[in-house]
């Protein structure tokens, strides 16, 4: 059942998801925490990591700028970190959007402790405990964590592996029951990797506007595109403040500093107040270090380097999975980001495969983490951000062999 020698084995593409549209409580945090702890071990090959490999990040420059800022005693208080955030960083964030074709009012930007806080604050601003939130299927578990944390329910919406959330299905769900908000990742969605076409983005924003349905847009991977043009955002098509856009530098510059932001549209006042009540302030030193880097160094040059690396590594990993995984395996075709979503034959249980791989010193992301239901039990997510090496290659081949052993 294992492909070994055919380097031209055909790649089978994923099929659209078909979740059962039932509103359910969310309880995924324990499984995700357990999985992430195993990923954090130093001797494991991190194919299951949700984080980008840090080897391509400019840590020396960032730390030098942070050290220089730390010598300024005027920054030792918290006032510079109070909402909405440090003005220098806010100016650079607004400038970056403008460079990518979207005009942003700097006064709308609220700096947060990573995109996770931005998502949590935006969700809290538009919904209350017990409300139902529409999500993609599969969906990034950080979205599910936010819903779980606030005692809300989630309903999964059918999602196409190339085009994104099924807008007609979302409209039908919103018509049939109260939906407080919709959480989506239109660019390089984790785990599917798709880039939603512009016409579908317009259609989704039009639906949200008509239905008065707030959309929380997770844009953390927007800078990691493989094509020639920076992708548009849902926010760029929003004329009524219905889109709450969240992003961060964690996936493109450094995860260690935990700096994100929100563009909350008409909900800005609520989000700023919640930010103040939640964490009071965002630390000033990492804000200033990143602002200094954006002002002085080649951020775009840095991004071109990691985009090129990720695109090459995505092709290598897709080829290896196609060659060494069991017959019938289906693989995503990411347009950006750094993860592959893989559908294995139905006989393969992802949690069993996860345990077998862990015994071999390899981590993978089991599909259970990306759904509120018992879905994607034969799916896994693999991270291709680490520079390609014999160790990575052996790990991918080993996971393929272990998957084949689960067919017996």
Predicted regions and their residues:
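N-terminal basic, amphipathic alpha-helical segments
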Residues: 1-67, 272, 276-283, 294, ...
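Short, solvent-exposed loop/turn segments at secondary-structure junctions
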Residues: 50-54, 116, 140, 187-189, ...
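Conserved core of the PLP fold type I
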Residues: 66-211, 216, 222-240, 310, ...
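Short, conserved active-site loop motifs that form the nucleotide-linked donor/cofactor pocket
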Residues: 213, 243, 329, 362
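Conserved PLP cofactor-binding pocket of PLP-dependent enzymes
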Residues: 220, 358-381
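Conserved core segment of the aminotransferase class I/II
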Residues: 239-308
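Conserved PLP-dependent catalytic core of the aminotransferase class-I/II
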Residues: 291, 304-329
